[in-house]
Amino acid sequence: LPMWKTVEEVENFLRTVAGKCKTTLLLETREAVECLDEVLKHGDMDEIHIGLNDLHLSYGLDFMFELLSNGIVEKIVKKIKRTGIPYGFGGIARLGCGDLPAERIIMEHYRLGSSRVILSRSFCNNDLISDLSEVENVFRNNMRLLREYEDTVSKMPDSEFVSNQAEIEKIVEKIVKMKRRKR
């Protein structure tokens, strides 16, 4: 269910689906964050994805990853985590890419207990590749690199995640300042 804003919208959605298929709530609005406690009491959804792009716009922020640096995502996932409902957030670029490097975002996924993510277009941009077999090769290679990095991250000590969180705050602040100067 995308762009929901009220408990009633979620209730109607879950009642309509009635267990016929897997349900995912896309938490993408400020209003959804504000009524999340009530929505989570229902517990009938299969998973929740926090959509950073629409959510940052809903909050009037300049950069979607401000939601990581300002604590909003952490506040949301703490609530979801208590319910046991699987969750994830945002999207990631391929390793070595992104205004905020994908490696840093992946570390935040691990720190926050996320179990799912959407891959951004830059992960495998099929607009730049016309040969379907080449798209498949690029995707497969990027997935292999991602899984290898995940394995490395899964073995990191907590201190690495604390350092990463602080570095994300610095990088996001710098990006936001640049965006505001361009206005």
Residue ranges and their predicted role:
Residues 1-19, 32-35, 57-76, 98, ...:
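Active-site-adjacent beta->alpha loops and helix N-cap segments on the catalytic face
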Residues 9, 30-43, 93-114:
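Catalytic cores of alpha/beta
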Residues 22, 29-33, 42-53, 58-59:
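Ligand/cofactor pocket segment of small-molecule handling proteins
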Residues 50-53, 66-69, 78-81, 85-101, ...:
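Active-site-adjacent structural elements that line small-molecule/cofactor binding pockets in enzymes
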